[in-house]
Swiss-Prot record:
PANTHER family in the cross-refs: INTERLEUKIN ENHANCER-BINDING FACTOR 3, ZINC FINGER RNA-BINDING PROTEIN
Protein name according to UniProt: Interleukin enhancer-binding factor 3
Subcellular location: Nucleus, Nucleolus; Cytoplasm; Nucleus
Stretch list, region Disordered: 52-85, 363-402, 466-495, 505-524, 631-661, 719-898
Annotated GO biological process: defense response to virus; negative regulation of DNA-templated transcription; negative regulation of translation; negative regulation of viral genome replication; positive regulation of DNA-templated transcription; protein phosphorylation; spliceosome-depend formation of circular RNA
Sequence position, cross-link Glycyl lysine isopeptide (Lys-Gly) (interchain with G-Cter in SUMO1): 348
Compositional bias segments (type: Basic and acidic residues): 74-85, 372-383, 472-481
Gene source species: Mus musculus (Mouse)
Gene: Ilf3
Residue stretches making up the DZF domain: 5-378
Gene3D superfamilies reported in the protein's UniProt record: 1.10.1410.40, 3.30.160.20, Beta Polymerase, domain 2 (3.30.460.10)
Keywords from the named record: Acetylation, Antiviral defense, Cytoplasm, DNA-binding, Isopeptide bond, Methylation, Nucleus, Phosphoprotein, Repeat, RNA-binding, Transcription, Transcription regulation, Ubl conjugation
GO function term, MF aspect, one: virus receptor activity
Subunit organization: Identified in a IGF2BP1-dependent mRNP granule complex containing untranslated mRNAs. Interacts with FUS and SMN. Interacts (via C-terminus) with PRMT1. Forms a complex with ILF2. Can also bind to PRKDC/XRCC7: this may stabilize the interaction of PRKDC/XRCC7 and the heterodimeric complex of XRCC6/KU70 and XRCC5/KU80. Forms a heteromeric complex with ZNF346 and ILF3. Found in a nuclear export complex with XPO5, ILF3, Ran and double-stranded RNA or double-stranded minihelix VA1 RNA. Found in a nuclear export complex with XPO5, RAN, ILF3, ZNF346 and double-stranded RNA.
Length: 898
C-alpha cells in the first residue's frame, strides 16, 4: 500500500534518520562472526561434556534420563530428541538485540542464553568457560578474551579487534521457573539445591529474555514499519534522557501495541506519529492503562518500574514531539537537519532490513529453531497464513530493487558511452537501438525506449563477460530470454524486446513483463494477426501448451500457413497468437511493399441494402466534379437536392437521373452529377474537366422521347481510382427496366464498390480493372465475337447472369467484383493504352481510347433494332463496362488522355 501523501515528508525524514543510525555492513559482519564462532564453540563444549558424562558411570547416565519438565517447551527446549534431553547443555539461543534485529551503530553488547538441563551451578559455569576457550581456538583463529561473572550467572566474551564487541552468555534452566511456580503454589520441594547454584533472579531474567525474543519474532518482525520505528526510538531514548526509562522491552511492547492495532499498514512516518499519539494520550500515566506484558502468566505492567515523575515527563515530551511533527518539524524530534523539499529518487536500500533480522539465524542447534513462536500463540494462528503471504510477496518484490544490469556494468566499467544507432517504427511505438563499446567489442540491443535499450545492451555485455545480470531474482528463464533476444529484430515495431520466433517449438519469446508495455505490432504498424489474415484467410490458431501456475501462465499457440507451422508464446492466448502471426509474417512475407498497404486503408463501408449478392466492399474515395464523388451513406429515394433527382422526369442541367423510382444523384445527397447536368438529344455531348486530383470525362447520349442521359466516366489521376456512372435505360414503351436504376461503380485498381444499392432485381455494373502490375489489355480481331472476363470473386458469387428485356436488349452481368469484357464485331476494334489500361467496348466501327493513367472509362454503344448493327441473339450476350443504355443512340467516342 502506498503511504498517504500527508506523511510522505515524515517518511523521508524517518527513513533518513534510520539510515544514519543503522549499523554498517562491517559492524554487522563482526557481530555475525563473533556470534557464530561462539555458537559453534558452545556446541563443541556440549558434546565434550556429554562424552564425559557417558564415560563416568551408569548411575549418572540413569540420572540424566529423568523426565524433562512440562514447562520446558515454553522456554524453547521442547520437542527435542531424547538424546538431546540427556545432555547437560541443551542448547544456545540468541536473545536481545541480536535476535530482534534492533542493533544500531555503537551497540557493542550482545547476548546469548545457554539452556541447561538442571539448575546451573558455579562448577558448571567454570567447566563451560574453561573448555570454551579451548574450543574457540579450534573454531577460529580470532582471539577472544573469556571472563566469568558468577554474580550475573554469565560468561563474558570480548574480542581483541575493532569494534570492541562484548558477548554475554547467560546460563539458565527451565527448572528454575518451574520450582518458583511450585513454591508460589505452596508445594514443598523434595530436592535440595546444590550449594553453588547460580542466582535465581538472573536465571529467571534470562528465561524472560528468551520469551521476549520469541514473542518479538512472532509479533513485531512481520509488522510493517515496526522494527524501523523501534530502531529510531531507541536512538531517541539514547539522546533524550527523559525517554531513557522506556528503553528496552517496554518500548518494544509500546510500538507493537500502537502499530499493530492500526486498521491498515502504515509507512514509517505515520507509524512513528501513531506511537507518539499513544504516549501523548497518557498511556504511561499513573492513572493510565499501562502496558501489559504478554510474556508473563500473571497480569504484569511492563512499565511498573517507572515512578510518577518519569511518567509525567515522558508524556509531556511525547506531546511536545507530536506538536512538532504536526507542524512539519519532525526533524527536530529526530535530531537531524531538515531535508530539502525535493530529493532525487534513489533506490531504497532499507528494504533488506525492514522485516528481517540483521543477523541470519544460527544453524548450530537445529533442535532449537527460532521460528517456533507462531505455534505458541494459538490465537494468532488464523492470520499466520496472511503474514506468510505478505512476507513472500515482500521477498519477491525485493530482488528487482537490487542493482540492475546497467548499474552493475557502470560499476565494473565506469564512463561507458552509449550511442543511439537508429530509431525505427511509428511515432506511437518507436524502437531504439543503442550500442556500447567495451574492451574493443561492440554490443548492440534495442528496446521501446533509450533507457530500456541501454539496459538490454548492459545485459548482453554482462552475459558476454559471464557475470550476473541482476535479473536472477526473477524467473531465470524468462529474464535471460528477454535479455538474449532483445536485439533480435529491430525492424519490427514492437514495444517489448523483439524475438525472431521460428517454427521450432523451443523458440524463445519475450518475457511477459515486457509485453505489458504496449501492443505487439508489425513493421507496418498493424496487429500481426490482422495483417496475416489479410494475406491468408481462414487460418486456425491452436493451443499447443499451457504451463505455469495461476499467477504466471505461459501459453503456446501454433498456426499453419502455406504448410509451415509457426509458434508463439505469451502470458495469454492473445499475446501468443500475435507472436505466432508475427513469426509467420517475418518468414513468409518479409518484404511486403508498403505501396499496396497504402491503398488498403480502412474505410467506412456503405450499408448493405441489396442483400448478400450486392454486398458493399471497401473502396477508394472518388474525385468528383465540384464536390465529393460519393456519399458514404446513400441518400434515400425522393430526396430533393440541387439536381432534383427524385421522381421527376425532366431535361436540363442538374436533373441527374430522370425516370421513375430513381433516387437522387451520386453527389451531394441527390444533387445529380455534381454541378454538371446532362441535356437530352445530345448524342455525343461530352464533359471533360481536369483537376489536380483527377480527370473526369463524361459523355451522354440523348434519347428520343425517353430523354435518357448518356453514360459518364470519371477517372482519377491516382492509381486505380475511378468512377463510372450509368444512365438508366428506357424501354420503348417508357417502362422502366424492372423498375431498377443503374449502379455506379468505384474502382480502386483491384476492387470495386457498388454504391447506391437498391433492393431491386437489377444486376450490378462495375468498372473492371486489375491490380497494379497485373493489367491486361484485351483486343479482338475482325470477324470475331468473343468475350473476356477477368474477375475477382465477390460475396455475390462468381457466376454470370443474363437478363433479357423484351427481347430487344440482351446483356450479361458478371457476378465478379472486378472484371472486364470487350466485344468486337466485324470491322470493330478496341484499343487499350497506358500502364493501367481499362476495358473499353466498341461496336460497329467505333473506338474507345483510354489514357495513360488508366481511370476506367466506359461507354455504351448500342443500336436499336433499326440501326445498321444489332447485337442480339443467343451468342450476343452483351455487357459493357458501365454502359449507359438509351434508345436510338448513335455511336459515341470518348477520348481521354492525361
Amino acid at each position: 500500500m502506498r503511504p498517504m501523501r500527508i506523511f510522505v515528508n515524515d517518511d523521508r525524514h524517518v527513513m533518513a534518520k534510520h539510515s544514519s543510525v543503522y549499523p554498517t555492513q562491517e559492524e554487522l559482519e563482526a557481530v555475525q562472526n563473533m556470534v557464530s564462532h561462539t555458537e559453534r564453540a558452545l556446541k563443541a563444549v556440549s558434546d565434550w561434556i556429554d562424552e564425559q558424562e557417558k564415560g563416568n558411570s551408569e548411575l549418572s547416565e540413569a540420572e540424566n534420563m529423568d523426565t524433562p519438565p512440562d514447562d520446558e517447551s515454553k522456554e524453547g527446549a521442547g520437542e527435542q530428541k531424547a538424546e538431546h534431553m540427556t545432555r547437560t547443555l541443551r542448547g544456545v539461543m540468541r536473545v536481545g538485540l541480536v535476535a530482534k534485529g534492533l542493533l544500531l551503530k555503537g551497540d557493542l553488547d550482545l547476548e546469548l542464553v545457554l539452556l541447561c538441563k538442571e539448575k546451573p551451578t558455579t562448577a558448571l559455569l567454570d567447566k563451560v568457560a574453561d573448555n570454551l576457550a579451548i574450543q574457540l581456538t579450534t573454531v577460529t583463529e580470532d582471539k577472544y578474551e573469556i571472563l566469568q561473572s558468577v554474580d550475573d550467572a554469565a560468561i563474558v566474551i570480548k574480542n581483541t579487534k575493532e569494534p570492541p564487541l562484548s558477548l554475554t552468555i547467560h546460563l539458565t534452566s527451565p527448572v528454575v521457573r518451574e520450582e518458583m511456580e511450585k513454591v508460589l503454589a505452596g508445594e514443598t520441594l523434595s530436592v535440595n539445591d546444590p550449594p553453588d547454584v547460580l542466582d535465581r533472579q538472573k536465571c529467571l531474567a534470562a528465561l524472560a529474555s528468551l520469551r521476549h525474543a520469541k514473542w518479538f519474532q512472532a509479533r513485531a518482525n512481520g509488522l510493517k514499519s515496526c522494527v524501523i520505528v523501534i530502531r529510531v526510538l531507541r536512538d531517541l531514548c539514547t539522546r533524550v534522557p527523559t525517554w531513557g526509562p522506556l528503553r528496552g522491552w517496554p518500548l518494544e511492547l509500546l510500538c507493537e501495541k500502537s502499530i499493530g492495532t492500526a486498521n491498515r499498514p502504515m509507512g514509517a512516518g505515520e507509524a512513528l506519529r501513531r506511537v507518539l499519539e499513544c504516549l501523548a494520550s497518557g498511556i504511561v500515566m499513573p492513572d493510565g492503562s499501562g502496558i501489559y506484558d504478554p510474556c508473563e502468566k500473571e497480569a504484569t505492567d511492563a512499565i511498573g518500574h517507572l515512578d510518577r515523575q518519569q511518567r509525567e515527563d515522558i508524556t509531556q515530551s511525547a506531546q511536545h514531539a507530536l506538536r512538532l511533527a504536526a507542524f512539519g518539524q519532525l526533524h527536530k524530534v529526530l535530531g537531524m537537519d531538515p531535508l530539502p523539499s525535493k530529493m532525487p529518487k534513489k533506490p531504497k536500500n532499507e528494504n533488506p532490513v525492514d522485516y528481517t533480522v540483521q543477523i541470519p539465524p544460527s544453524t548450530t542447534y537445529a533442535i532449537t529453531p527460532m521460528k517456533r513462536p507462531m505455534e505458541e500463540d494459538g490465537e494468532e494462528k488464523s492470520p499466520s497464513k496472511k503474514k506468510k503471504k505478505i512476507q513472500k510477496k515482500e521477498e519477491k518484490a525485493d530482488p528487482p530493487q537490487a542493482m540492475n544490469a546497467l548499474m552493475r556494468l557502470n560499476q565494473l566499467k565506469p564512463g561507458l558511452q552509449y550511442k543511439l544507432i537508429s530509431q525505427t517504427g511509428p511515432v506511437h511505438a518507436p524502437i531504439f537501438t543503442m550500442s556500447v563499446e567495451v574492451d574493443g567489442s561492440n554490443f548492440e540491443a534495442s528496446g521501446p525506449s533509450k533507457k530500456t535499450a541501454k539496459l538490454h545492451v548492459a545485459v548482453k555485455v554482462l552475459q558476454d563477460m559471464g557475470l550476473p545480470t541482476g535479473a536472477e531474482g526473477r524467473d531465470s528463464s524468462k529474464g535471460e530470454d528477454s535479455a538474449e533476444e532483445s536485439d533480435g529484430k529491430p525492424a519490427i515495431v514492437a514495444p517489448p524486446p523483439v524475438v525472431e520466433a521460428v517454427s521450432n517449438p523451443s523458440s524463445v519469446f519475450p518475457s511477459d513483463a515486457t509485453t505489458e508495455q504496449g501492443p505487439i505490432l508489425t513493421k507496418h504498424g498493424k496487429n500481426p494477426v490482422m495483417e496475416l489474415n489479410e494475406k491468408r484467410r481462414g487460418l486456425k490458431y491452436e493451443l499447443i501448451s499451457e504451463t505455469g501456475g495461476s499467477h504466471d501462465k505461459r501459453f503456446v499457440m501454433e498456426v499453419e500457413v502455406d504448410g509451415q507451422k509457426f509458434q508463439g508464446a505469451g502470458s495469454n492466448k492473445k499475446v501468443a497468437k500475435a507472436y505466432a502471426a508475427l513469426a509467420a509474417l517475418e518468414k513468409l512475407f518479409p518484404d511486403t511493399p508498403l505501396a499496396l498497404e497504402a491503398n488498403k486503408k480502412k474505410r467506412t463501408p456503405v450499408p448493405v441494402r441489396g442483400g448478400p449478392k450486392f454486398a458493399a466492399k471497401p473502396h477508394n474515395p472518388g474525385f468528383g466534379m465540384g464536390g465529393p464523388m460519393h456519399n458514404e451513406v446513400p441518400p434515400p429515394p425522393n430526396i430533393r437536392g440541387r439536381g432534383r433527382g427524385g421522381n421527376i422526369r425532366g431535361r436540363g442541367r442538374g436533373r441527374g437521373f430522370g425516370g421513375a423510382n430513381h433516387g437522387g444523384g451520386y453527389m451531394n445527397a441527390g444533387a445529380g452529377y455534381g454541378s454538371y447536368g446532362y441535356s437530352s438529344n445530345s448524342a455525343t455531348a461530352g464533359y471533360s474537366q481536369f483537376y489536380s486530383n483527377g480527370g473526369h470525362s463524361g459523355n451522354a447520349g440523348g434519347g428520343g422521347s425517353g430523354g435518357g442521359g448518356g453514360s459518364s466516366s470519371y477517372s482519377s489521376y491516382y492509381q486505380g481510382d475511378s468512377y463510372n456512372s450509368p444512365v438508366p435505360p428506357k424501354h420503348a414503351g417508357k417502362k422502366p427496366l424492372h423498375g431498377g436504376q443503374q449502379k455506379a461503380s468505384y474502382s480502386s485498381g483491384y476492387q470495386s464498390h457498388q454504391g447506391q444499392q437498391q433492393p431491386y432485381n437489377q444486376s450490378q455494373y462495375s468498372s473492371y480493372g486489375t491490380p497494379q502490375g497485373k493489367q491486361k489489355g484485351y483486343g479482338h480481331g475482325q470477324g470475331s465475337y468473343s468475350s473476356y472476363s477477368n474477375s475477382y470473386n465477390s460475396p455475390g458469387g462468381g457466376g454470370g447472369s443474363d437478363y433479357s428485356y423484351d427481347s430487344k436488349f440482351n446483356y450479361s452481368g458478371s457476378g465478379g467484383r472486378s472484371g472486364g469484357n470487350s466485344y468486337g464485331s466485324s470491322g470493330s476494334s478496341s484499343y487499350n493504352t497506358g500502364s493501367h489500361g481499362g476495358y473499353g467496348t466498341g461496336s460497329g466501327g467505333s473506338s474507345s481510347y483510354q489514357g495513360k493513367q488508366g481511370g476506367y472509362s466506359s461507354q455504351s454503344n448500342y443500336s436499336s433494332p433499326g440501326s445498321s448493327q444489332s447485337y442480339s441473339g443467343p451468342a450476343s450476350s452483351y455487357q459493357s463496362s458501365q454502359g449507359g443504355y438509351s434508345r436510338n443512340t448513335e455511336h459515341s467516342m470518348n477520348y481521354q488522355y492525361r
